[in-house]
């Protein structure tokens, strides 16, 4: 049903953009069921995050046009977020993302692991989904790209495992840059855990 709905929306010329209602699981299941010829012939924005990463990456590999890693429709949005996405989806012939960062974004703690200037295609999303699609035909080429990643409810050792998978597959070594975003509740709840912290895992994989 989800694949049929998505195919219908991309075949309908009256539909300007497709907003995912929520994330969760299962987006990868529908990839072989999508009409990629119709999707390529009818470009329109796909907006969502989390499990929707599977669709974003497949679109980057198969459709040839960008999508938006942004809020799902069921999320609670600030007014500036909704206004920005509305302009992107409906108010411009050529979508352009711009403007100053909002208060929430500009006030967050950030640190630089490896300094410098990078330019490249922006690819990524949920780290679990990125690593799950490794070795399939649904990933775009990462050479020269800037990879952004986020995740939720994953223990430090699982984050380490997924980053190690990207390293062993050669992905980390061919990137122009990496942005490691929010990792909500990414800590183990196992009693007596004495492994690496999340910061240590990130530094081990991304530091010079």
Predicted regions: what they are:
Residues 64-131, 135:
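Conserved anion/nucleotide-ligand pocket segment
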Residues 122-166:
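Oxyanion-binding "anion nests"
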Residues 162-208:
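C-terminal active-site/capping subdomain that shapes the small-molecule cofactor and substrate pocket
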Residues 34-58, 66-73:
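Short, acidic/small-residue loops that bind anionic groups at enzyme active sites
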Residues 17-28, 33, 49:
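N-terminal glycine-rich "phosphate-gripper" loop used for MgATP/nucleotide binding
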Residues 1-14:
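ATP/NTP phosphate-donor binding region
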Residues 14, 39-45, 63-65, 175-176, ...:
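A short helix->loop->beta-strand "cap" motif at the edges of active sites that frequently abuts
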């Amino acid at each position: 049903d989800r694949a049929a709905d998505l195919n219908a929306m991309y075949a309908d010329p009256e539909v300007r953009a497709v907003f995912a209602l929520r994330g969760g699981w299962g987006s990868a299941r529908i990839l072989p069921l999508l009409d990629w010829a119709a999707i390529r012939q009818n470009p329109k924005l796909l907006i969502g995050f989390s499990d929707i990463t599977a669709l974003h990456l497949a679109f980057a590999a198969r459709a040839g046009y960008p999508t938006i890693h942004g809020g799902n429709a069921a999320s609670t949005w600030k007014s500036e977020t909704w206004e920005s996405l509305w302009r992107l989806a409906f108010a411009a012939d050529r979508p352009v993302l711009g403007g100053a960062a909002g208060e929430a974004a500009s006030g967050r703690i950030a640190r630089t692991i490896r300094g410098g200037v990078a330019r490249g295609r922006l690819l990524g999303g949920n780290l679990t989904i990125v690593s799950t699609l490794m070795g399939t035909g649904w990933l775009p080429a990462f050479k020269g790209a800037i990879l952004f990643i986020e995740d939720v409810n994953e223990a430090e050792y699982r984050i380490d495992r997924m980053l190690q998978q990207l390293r062993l597959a050669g992905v980390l070594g061919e990137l122009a840059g990496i942005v490691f975003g929010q990792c909500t509740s990414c800590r183990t709840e196992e009693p007596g855990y004495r492994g690496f912290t999340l910061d240590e895992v990130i530094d081990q994989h991304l530091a010079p």
